[in-house]
């Protein structure tokens, strides 16, 4: 939405490549692969997706978690929020049993929110994360692609993951 309406030039943070999105934006080279993850309170850690049957799972609307759970786990009650902050606050407030989104996000969130644990670190298909620009913005797309290649040569992405998320 922000690219299409010319509010921003680049979407960089945790933007999953999907067919639907690729019709609206141009994706640069991917820099990371993710699956879904599930975070829940340490007092009631969800370690298997079957534990979610009949329980309330918090998700953000429009994320890959939404179609995944609707299609593959219809017994899970989905509580959907428009904004990530609202979804995370719902988990903090106990309005749901767990929260699911990209595993890198729940790992990072659990790292700074004591009392919560990622009991399911990888669920569903592996998806790629890539920057996106407005359709047809070839100059910016080429520049981003070159920067990703340069960062890849330095092992930047691997080192960053090892330093921040791998310990979780």
Regions found by a protein language model. Name each.
Residues 1-51, 117-124:
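Acidic, polar ligand-binding/catalytic clefts
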Residues 3-4, 52, 91-92, 131, ...:
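Hydrophobic residues within well-ordered alpha-helices
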Residues 6-7, 56, 80, 95, ...:
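Conserved functional loop/turn residues at catalytic and ligand-binding sites
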Residues 7, 11, 48, 65, ...:
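Stable alpha-helical elements in mature extracytoplasmic
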Residues 13-23, 68-71, 92-125:
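A ligand-binding cleft/hinge motif common to bilobed small-molecule-binding domains
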Residues 15-16, 33-89, 103-107, 138:
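Bilobed "Venus flytrap"/periplasmic-binding protein-like clamshell domains
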Residues 32-40, 103, 107-149, 167-168:
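Periplasmic-binding protein-like
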Residues 64-81, 117-122, 148-168:
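Ligand-binding clefts/hinges and TM-proximal coupling segments of bilobed small-molecule sensing domains
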């Amino acid at each position: 939405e922000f690219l299409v309406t010319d509010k921003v030039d680049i979407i960089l943070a945790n933007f999953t490549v999907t067919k639907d999105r690729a019709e609206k934006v141009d994706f640069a080279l991917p820099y990371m692969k993710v699956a879904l993850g599930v975070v829940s309170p340490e007092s009631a850690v969800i370690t298997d997706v079957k534990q979610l049957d009949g329980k309330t799972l918090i998700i953000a609307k429009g994320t890959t978690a939404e179609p995944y759970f609707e299609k593959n786990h219809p017994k899970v009650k989905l509580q959907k929020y428009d904004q990530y902050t609202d979804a995370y606050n719902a988990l903090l407030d106990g309005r749901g049993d767990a929260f699911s989104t990209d595993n890198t996000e729940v790992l990072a969130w659990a790292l700074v929110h004591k009392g919560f644990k990622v009991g399911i670190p990888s669920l569903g298909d592996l998806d790629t994360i890539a920057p996106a620009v407005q359709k047809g913005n070839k100059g910016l797309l080429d520049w981003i692609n070159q920067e990703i290649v340069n960062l890849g040569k330095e092992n930047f992405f691997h080192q960053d993951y090892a330093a921040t998320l791998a310990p979780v």
